[in-house]
């Protein structure tokens, strides 16, 4: 709040300063030659790569005492570090570098644009525009000028990386939009505006990640590790598919046995049957869905947006059924709560089933449409599927992480209340005299099964949410670090088509790449619940249900009439 007040005060001062400044950048041709260098005394401009300035400056201020209050108005922008170059840019305007040249050296247009791109969006939030007196078109492009300061950039990058890891705000928002020219030629896309890469320095539009695995400078994992991830996912998806199918068949064989409050497990199993099918299709399809050719070169890039119909279909199915599983988990906890705390019967809970279905299928459908409209679909090069938020931290947090956490939290509250009620019922039964041990034993078994299933669902789902948050916060740093190493390697500059100098390469945030165990746990946590559902239905009653179903089918088989047998014997 205090920061916002400071920024509002800054912008009010800026408006007044624009009216007071009558000397433009272009009027410096009449710059006086009777001048001398003086030591910088303006606090904001101390400890830069230069310590001597000259006046009048580029805005017409004749002394440092006059320029000091004017540049001090920008202190809030410096403090929030909206741009890595804002401090250097302002100082080269208000306290220009003193040299042996006749005129003071102006800041380069690139330096101005870097400062403007970082801070203009913040100014617009408060209803102000970038000051006309600092119009970047007034500054030179190729003449002698002050460019980016590498040490300043490094310090600012380190600050931004630390801020992102701590709070996850700048990483997830990524409001700064970089120039598309920063994207290497072989990663540049021509298929639409929905392609972009989230970097620590901002969002890089019209750009996508290469799909090819590389062992020299891998994007997180090399080819060998990617194969391990693909095999790992295939094994767990097959196991999840088999167990989910077994659960579905078990329910359908004797549906009356699984009334509410346990009926939602049927729909949970159906959701994970669909999720496992998506992963198996991704394994079989290799990179046909997650990757494609979207630029002017034959380089395969990660699919983003809804252009690839197959990719979009996989992503929607994966997202829809994952959100439905979260909703059915919440309904399962609610049904247990109604049965244990409010003493509702199975018929009373079943009467609410139309509302349960409307919520569990309707809300995910709305979210799935939103995902498509916002182009939040992209490919996962490690599994071959398409899903939400692999290269989009905002989508991963808003569409995946948040619903999972909300459903887990609400479900946990309902579950704890239900279990507490069962504990009270157990204490009450102990006071009875008829068949006490038998009743207590049945209740304890039910409590044990409910608690075990809740743990086997909650732990993997919570782990999945934690890994998603970890991925969303660190993905911009991983991408920027990978792009930095590609940019500075001479053999990669030509291979990828970097068109700007090495000095302009992205800074290395020095964030360690994730361990393979993180992504192994990510994929298993999305599939293991399907196996958990099968554990719930495994019992002696299940064997009895299958035996009865077999006998029922056998009794329907056609029998040979007796007189036909007699004829054949003759």
Curated annotation (Swiss-Prot):
GO terms for cellular component: early endosome; plasma membrane. GO terms for biological process: canonical Wnt signaling pathway; embryo development ending in birth or egg hatching; embryonic digestive tract morphogenesis; embryonic morphogenesis; endodermal cell fate specification; engulfment of apoptotic cell; establishment of mitotic spindle orientation; gastrulation. Residues 17-230, 286-319, 370-395, 471-515 are extracellular. Changing residue 548 to R: Abolishes sequestration in endosomes by plr-1. Its main location: membrane. Disulfide bonds join 37-98, 45-91, 82-119, 108-145, 112-136. Residues 32-148 form the FZ domain. Changing residue 541 to R: Abolishes sequestration in endosomes by plr-1. The FZ domain is involved in binding with Wnt ligands. This is Protein mom-5. It comes from Caenorhabditis elegans. The lineage of its organism: Eukaryota, Metazoa, Ecdysozoa, Nematoda, Chromadorea.
